[in-house]
Amino acid sequence: MATARLILSLLTIGLSRARVEESPRRVLSQNQSQVFVNLARLPIATPACSAARWGRVLELVHHLGAAAHEISAKFRDEGFWGVFGSHYHGAKVNFMWNAICNDEQLANKPSLQVCEIGFNAGQSAVLFLESGRETRVLSFDLGDYPWNKKQASTVKAAYGERFDIIFGNSLETVQNFVAKNKDFKCDVAFIDGAKTRQIRNQDLKNIRRLSTVGDTLLLFDEATTMECMNQGDCQSTRQNHNSWGGATLAYYDAVSSGLMKILDCAWPVGMEGADGVCKARYAK
């Protein structure tokens, strides 16, 4: 009888261990978009801009990236084609987060309206949405990747009325939005759409129409050198005009014309002078 009880106890322990070991696998096999939505809907107990809140952002972004990969295997990296790309080692997103959290002018606002050109998989939108309880995000995106629209639906399900997106060519959609919403203003604007000089120039000008001179915090990606953007030597940038260089030459144009003033930039280690992110304000 004692032997039988011992065998039964061992079997029970074995089954319990099996259940514990299976639990992580069940979590990983869940639909990642739903995991993201459930997590985003949890009550926020951490202060805005705290280290704990940033940890929440990273967890949300992880699941949102996994959701994009479930849609298409082409979304290969957790932050594929975006500022959360693993090869940036957090340099870009940390700069953006700190730019918002440490800006004295933004600190005086009860809530923020963020506008971005370039939604991709929605990870930058989540960064902005998590920066404050009442922060709202309006995204403009071409919608030409297989994950764009499903990811937008996922972010919408998580944040409701705080998030909206308009699909189409930003050269048309932003202007159309301005024409119909003349009093709408962005407290923060992030430009990370098409990389060519011509289109980036127009995106800067269009977003200016949704901004307040000297007040709206402007963030932009694909910066090569501070020297070039501030009307200095652009030789290396011009040689790279078919890549990020096109965007940087647009920043050169914007500074030269007095449209904006660059405040600061950051580059991932090993990418200095090649692919950074900056903050600025419109000057006129």
In which residue ranges do the predicted regions lie?
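A short alpha-helical cap/connector motif
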Residues: 4, 23-190, 194-284
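Classical eukaryotic N-terminal signal peptides for Sec-dependent ER targeting/secretion
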Residues: 1-8
